[in-house]
Amino acid sequence: MTQTQYRAGPDANGLFGSFGGRYVAETLMPLVLDLAREYEAAKADPKFLEELAYFQRDYIGRPNPLYFAERLTEHCGGAKIFFKREELNHTGAHKVNNCIGQVLLAKRMGKKRLIAETGAGMHGVATATVAARFGLPCVIYMGATDIERQQANVFRMKLLGAEIVPVTAGTGTLKDAMNEALRDWVTNVEDTFYLIGTVAGPHPYPAMVRDFQSIIGKETRAQLQEKEGRLPDSLIACVGGGSNAMGLFHDFLDDASVQIIGVEAGGHGVHTDKHAASLNGGVPGVLHGNRTYLLQDDDGQITDAHSISAGLDYPGIGPEHAYLHEVKRVEYVSITDDEALDAFHATCRLEGIIPALESSHALAEAIKRAPKLPKDHLMVICLSGRGDKDMQTVMNHMAAQEKQA
């Protein structure tokens, strides 16, 4: 492997190895090609980058801290654990990093309407937020199942002026919401910008979303250099579609000394049919415009994903993750619902931080690994979002446990 090989992708066709690409309807192809051209031009435009930096600083509140989790470190008795505090961003998660970038691009392209899909509602909230800030009408597609379990975020989106379209097709979750958003885009190609929330979809989305999220890893590198004078030994992030993970990982892919771990949602266990671990329990296929690992049945039909966290129950994964899995640069593991909940409670009690259930999957893996590692091992966890949105889920789970007891 040459030194830059891992970070070089995608190629001109949007491929990371054999993953990614542009599998879209004929009507969308000109649009997707146009978006790729516009994005390349924007990346090279100092004015665009200057405006992006302004909003990252004054609107999102970056840089956010790299925080030494002293009590969790003591509790584990091994590696020195740091949290990259994405939950301190405006809107409470990493999602807004990408939304600000894409809305500036939409504005540059003269688009008059935003659409987006959302699962946990955090991308919907971030999209509604930037739509309000830039005075654009906004339609959010959200699975009916997710609307039920994310009432607070639904209300936040409405407060911000977004129209929410409930999707009852399929399981009424993120995959179905994305299908509906793609249908809308095909119908309204002229004036509409589709703001995809993760590192999936047709090229250029996986690379573009990664680039807007890569500020996470860039800041982490500089902050750890300042605190410890060196690179981290390991990075851990949860992976649904995988944008917070790609954001943290990307800057370190060519640093061979840095171990990188992505944590999928193991649900009730990857040996059951109730999980969302596409890499640990899926096979390659095509969904939502790109080739990647997917949860499929023997007939190639997409199966339902399950996770206690609404943001991880997607039956696929970003194509760059699929590539990094195949070339073995990143290790992908899974954490069950119960393990994530235990880590959620531990982080609340030990650090006074209420993490999102998504982030709790990464925390659970860290809690497993840290005790076996030396005290000078530097471990960074991406705390991708805050747990306010998950209160009802955790309350329901605790009530169910009490009943069983």
From Swiss-Prot:
Pathway: Amino-acid biosynthesis; L-tryptophan biosynthesis; L-tryptophan from chorismate: step 5/5. Its EC number is 4.2.1.20. It comes from the Bacteria. Keywords: Amino-acid biosynthesis, Aromatic amino acid biosynthesis, Lyase, Pyridoxal phosphate, Tryptophan biosynthesis. It catalyses: (1S,2R)-1-C-(indol-3-yl)glycerol 3-phosphate + L-serine = D-glyceraldehyde 3-phosphate + L-tryptophan + H2O. InterPro entries: Trp_synth_b_CS, Trp_synth_beta, Trp_synth_beta/beta-like, TrpB-like_PALP, TrpB-like_PALP_sf. The modification N6-(pyridoxal phosphate)lysine is found at K95. GO terms for cellular component: cytoplasm. The beta subunit is responsible for the synthesis of L-tryptophan from indole and L-serine. Tetramer of two alpha and two beta chains. This is Tryptophan synthase beta chain. The gene is trpB.
